[in-house]
């Protein structure tokens, strides 16, 4: 009987396990995660626990190979779309009110955008942050009923690829254990980037460096962007320059809240969107992210930038006219308000001018915006060097029974991460 060990209970690992049990996989499935099950996972633990960061996110499932990673490079366009649709179907399947899922499917780029920005058009399902928690509980119950074994609040301390052994210990270091695997699915997510780097260094895995992805979380009253929201709920404005490209990312509307993420002890920002009308605040927030190519040691560079924009043990907020917003719980967003951008521009080492220009051009496209906006600094997507894998099943070229998925393979977004896990499970079922 085969043993499948999945490191990380994020979107990739959970979709892999679901694909296996849906098809009556006869082996054992073990999932190890540093966080908690969905019944015990607190709201502030946004990176670990059942469904990982994706399960505590804005709740939007994009359906396109233009964004989110290199899925179509691995499997081709048609297969990539099929895999992502399976992920969407899983979220719908465990949703307590699937009829409330909203599909945005823009088809034509509006003329008022074209002089200043490109607009990427693709379908997007809006699940809702508040419903993700209930989805997680139903999904977890299903996997438990199918015999999947979870090891909560446990951290993997070592993987021996030669002996197919995973060693893990409880986060309070009071107990430890070993699991042997026939197939290992490595999906540690953002919170495991350091461990991923250690593993790749220990086993001298061939890798490809990924560019810097850093920027700000922009927030303004929704009314200024309504004419674009009517075209595309999760709009993606973008522009490409020689060594820097910019895009708006993870747009939240109607009941939109800025969320704090803590990684490596530093604060950064993201956004959530609720579906329940009682949370409506008529705000919009989205990331303005730069992808910067050609930076030496991009991961280290990103870490240093984030450290340099911390003040009073949190990130920073700047606005010409506004003050920081509150969370959906009515608590002020953790941030330090500053009255000018000098310290931010210094930390970004000359690259902040691209964000300045992006905001200036938004004020031209949306003339009512003027100074009615604010930015939370930083927003960052840490991307460790990407290991080289076999495209057919995402297995390491040196260790064919070890599969990298999700953020560990530079996926960005729920749909692509889930598709990684689904693909690996399909290949396991074939063998």
Regions found by a protein language model. Give the residues of each.
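Dinucleotide-binding Rossmann-like beta1-alpha1 core, especially the glycine-rich loop
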Residues: 49-102
């Amino acid at each position: 009987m085969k043993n499948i060990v999945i490191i990380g209970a994020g979107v990739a690992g959970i979709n892999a396990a679901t694909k296996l049990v849906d098809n009556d996989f006869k082996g054992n499935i073990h999932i190890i995660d540093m966080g908690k099950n969905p019944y015990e996972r607190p709201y502030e633990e946004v990176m670990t626990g059942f469904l990982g960061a994706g399960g505590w996110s804005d709740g939007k499932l994009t359906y396109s190979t233009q964004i989110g990673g290199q899925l179509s490079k691995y499997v081709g366009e048609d297969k990539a779309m099929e895999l992502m649709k399976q992920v969407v179907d899983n979220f719908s399947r465990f949703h307590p009110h699937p009829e409330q899922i909203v599909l945005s499917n823009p088809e034509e780029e509006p003329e008022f955008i074209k002089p200043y920005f490109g607009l990427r058009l693709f379908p997007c399902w809006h699940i809702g942050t508040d419903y993700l928690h209930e989805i997680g509980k139903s999904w977890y119950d299903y996997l438990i009923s199918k015999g999947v074994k979870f090891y909560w609040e446990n951290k993997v301390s070592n993987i021996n690829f030669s002996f197919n052994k995973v060693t893990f210990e409880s986060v309070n270091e009071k107990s430890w254990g070993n699991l042997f695997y026939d197939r290992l699915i490595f999906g540690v997510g953002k919170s495991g980037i350091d461990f991923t780097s250690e593993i790749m260094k220990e086993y001298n895995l061939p890798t490809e460096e990924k560019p810097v992805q850093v920027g700000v979380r922009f927030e303004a009253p929704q009314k200024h962007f309504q004419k674009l929201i009517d075209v595309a709920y999760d709009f993606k404005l973008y522009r490409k320059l020689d060594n820097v490209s910019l895009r708006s990312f993870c747009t939240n509307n109607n009941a939109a809240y800025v969320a704090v993420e803590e990684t490596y002890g530093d604060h950064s920002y993201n956004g959530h969107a609720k579906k329940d009308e009682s949370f409506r605040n008529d705000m919009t927030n989205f990331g303005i992210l730069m992808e910067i190519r050609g930076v030496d040691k991009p991961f280290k560079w990103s870490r240093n930038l984030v450290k340099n924009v911390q003040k009073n043990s949190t990130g920073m907020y700047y606005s010409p006219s506004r003050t920081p917003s509150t969370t959906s719980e009515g608590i002020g967003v953790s941030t330090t308000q500053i009255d000018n951008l000098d310290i931010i521009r210094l930390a970004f080492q000359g690259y902040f001018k691209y964000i300045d220009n992006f905001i200036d051009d938004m004020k031209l496209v949306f003339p009512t915006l003027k100074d009615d906006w604010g930015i939370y600094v930083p927003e960052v997507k840490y991307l460790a060097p990407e290991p080289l894998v076999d495209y057919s099943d995402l297995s390491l070229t040196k260790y064919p029974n070890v599969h990298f998925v999700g953020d560990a393979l530079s996926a960005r977004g729920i749909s692509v991460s889930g598709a990684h896990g689904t693909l690996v499970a399909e290949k396991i079922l074939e063998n």
